[in-house]
Amino acid sequence: MSTAESRNHYKEVPTIEHYSEAIGITNRKKMDWRGWLRKSTLVRSQLIRGCMAEFLAVFVLMVFIEGSAATAIFTNRRQDILFGSISSGLGVAMAVYVAGGVSGAFLNPAVALAFAVLGKLSWKNCIFYMISQYLAAFVASCTMFAYLYEALNNFDGGERQMFGPNGTAHIWSTYPQPFLSPHTAFADQVFCTAILLIVVLAMCDSKNWKPHNGFLPIAIGLLIITISCTLSYNAGAAMNPSRDLAPRFFSYLAGYGTEPFGVKGYTWFFVPVLGSHCGAIIGGAIYQLFIGGQWPDDTSDTNSVSSMSYNEDNSTLTKRKQVSNIVHDSKGAKGSSTAPVN
């Protein structure tokens, strides 16, 4: 056989790919535009995915908060605390649903800081999440200003005012009551955020009565409604620095001048930021001192009887654990294929 004939012979020898294609078996899948788009936009960095989730969730949160505040002002419902509280609480719940499965949905720089201090969140993630949250709040404020632009002009005649009958500053940020002193305002922000963290940590504690993940956003939303209904009279209960500071910067750019920062002689604008961070750390420390750090070492199994018997004395606890072990052993024996048959 010549060299040329040998080459043609080997070219015509069927390969395994030929047989696979002949019987319809192939590992090559045709990628449609959806698969191509997903592959092209897939982010493999867990940190970046978390930042993206925080950004989108805070954006959604701010749309609901600022939208509800604008609706209250435009419809003369400024004093309707329940309306604003329910809107804010449900907005938080929806935002937690958006990012809960990706980043944990911190939504709040103060909450992220408290979790980092307690060792529940890495400092790297904390810093980048905080940046994402501030950016999202600013972008959401820009978006809502464009969305509400004609309504704002219809309401105030195109002249941006802070307070009074045509004042719209409360759409963007929180402001204290005229009678509130600076030190009381600071204590107010610390107290509100501390309460927030105590309950949030309780809800996220697997050794406590943690709600199911699917219900957790609703529970957190109910918490926000409760705090807003009870602790918002003094200064609006911001509890979230990104929700307050970023829109305040935007309102400065949107025609309100320096007044958003000049309230109370420039002693207010930093209070919701500093007070919220301090309150979050204090609230986290209080929960760890009273609850989180007091769990016995043998309560890792949250479904066991012993974890539900935390307040019992040691002897009773031991007896209940023995009963629990006997029950588990008997169930295991019945379900085992090697168990003796009587």
Curated annotation (Swiss-Prot):
Motif window: NPA 1: 108-110
GO cellular component terms attached to this protein's record: basolateral plasma membrane
Reported induction: Transcript abundance is low but expression is slightly up-regulated in the inactive stage (during anhydrobiois).
InterPro entries xref list: Aquaporin-like (IPR023271), MIP (IPR000425), MIP/Aquaporin (IPR050363)
GO molecular function, one term: glycerol channel activity
Transmembrane intervals: 55-75, 98-118, 126-146, 184-204, 215-235, 266-286
Region (Disordered): 302-342
Gene3D superfamilies in the cross-refs: Glycerol uptake facilitator protein
Biased composition, class Polar residues, residue ranges: 302-327
Sugar-bearing residue positions: 166, 314
Mode of membrane association: Multi-pass membrane protein
Subcellular location: Cell membrane
Keywords attached to this entry: Cell membrane, Glycoprotein, Membrane, Repeat, Stress response, Transmembrane, Transmembrane helix, Transport
Superkingdom classification of source: Eukaryota
Chain ranges for the short sequence motif NPA 2 as given in the UniProt record: 240-242
Pfam families: MIP
Keyword presence, Transport: yes
Family under the similarity heading: Belongs to the MIP/aquaporin (TC 1.A.8) family.
Function noted in UniProt: Aquaglyceroporin that may modulate the water content and osmolytes during anhydrobiosis.
Record comment regarding domains: Aquaporins contain two tandem repeats each containing three membrane-spanning domains and a pore-forming loop with the signature motif Asn-Pro-Ala (NPA).
Official protein name in the record: Aquaporin-8
Protein species of origin: Milnesium tardigradum
Organism phylogeny: Eukaryota, Metazoa, Ecdysozoa, Tardigrada, Eutardigrada
